[in-house]
A protein has these predicted regions:
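Acidic, polar-rich low-complexity tracts and alpha-helical solenoid repeat scaffolds
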Residues: 5-262
């Protein structure tokens, strides 16, 4: 196929209208090799149903999936790479297609402030890839992607809990920080989460009706103990001790009042 034909707009339009499957396929591969993924993808999309049963079909489908990836159509590339490795599980491209599905989903993962459904899907596919290809040459890159996605979920979980705290929804904040600590025990946000959980519990107790205060102050005292055990050198230690002292004083007063009433 002539370079002149590939390089001209009229030549490309003629290829689109052509019914010569072999000529179209040859042109699509040449466009692909030149890095013109839009034209290659357009031709390959037309060719795929026409190549069924032919040896070129496998390469055409893999290349078509990659044209979508190279054009940053990550949702589509994830779909087509999955379709490829499901259709050709024994292909020489199968492992790379599985990897590229995972990479497409990784690229399609949104900022942490947004819904993270795609992130969870990406992590699931990455784990499936590692289970299937434990010795893969892509292993280090895939593990790096997984760690980055986990950090994104970690940040979302922490900022979500922090938002409850900032909005003064203290009960929800305590619940969210507890879930965060359980889900991410080694998080770099751990110290801040533990302190804000204590602070939220103290404020919750302080703002509670009288018959719930003692129980909630005692919970704040328990959170203080956990905090100083885990972070004895914390820069927030002085403020934590202040809340502890106030909680302890409040509990002692309530106990004294209860004894006097009896």
């Amino acid at each position: 196929l002539s370079t002149l034909l590939l390089g001209s707009c009229s030549g490309y339009q003629k290829l689109l209208k052509s019914t010569d499957v072999n000529k179209k396929y040859e042109a699509a591969i040449q466009y692909y090799d030149k890095g013109d993924f839009f034209k290659a993808g357009t031709l390959l999309e037309e060719l795929i149903p026409l190549l069924k049963g032919r040896p070129e079909a496998e390469k055409a489908q893999f290349y078509f999936a990659n044209t979508n990836y190279r054009q940053r159509n990550y949702t589509l590339s994830a779909f087509y790479f999955k379709n490829f490795h499901d259709t050709y599980p024994n292909s020489e491209y199968a492992q790379e297609a599985y990897f590229m599905q995972a990479k497409s989903l990784f690229k399609d993962s949104p900022e942490y402030q947004l819904d993270q459904t795609n992130t969870y899907t990406a992590i699931e596919v990455i784990q499936e890839f590692l289970n299937r290809y434990p010795e893969s040459r892509f292993r280090a890159e895939v593990e790096g992607m997984s760690q980055e996605l986990q950090k994104k979920l970690e940040t979302k979980a922490f900022t979500g809990a922090r938002l409850y705290y900032d909005l003064r929804y203290y009960q929800s904040a305590v619940t969210a920080f507890t879930g965060f600590q359980q889900g991410y025990p080694a998080s770099p946000y751990g110290e801040q989460a533990a302190f804000l959980k204590l602070s939220a519990q103290y404020d919750l107790a302080h703002e509670s009706v009288e018959n719930k205060q003692q129980e909630r102050y005692l919970e704040a005292i328990a959170f203080y103990q956990s905090f100083i055990d885990a972070f004895p050198q914390s820069k927030s230690l002085k403020e934590a001790e202040r809340m502890y002292d106030l909680a302890r004083t409040a509990v002692d007063k309530m106990k004294t009042a209860g004894t006097a009433a009896n």
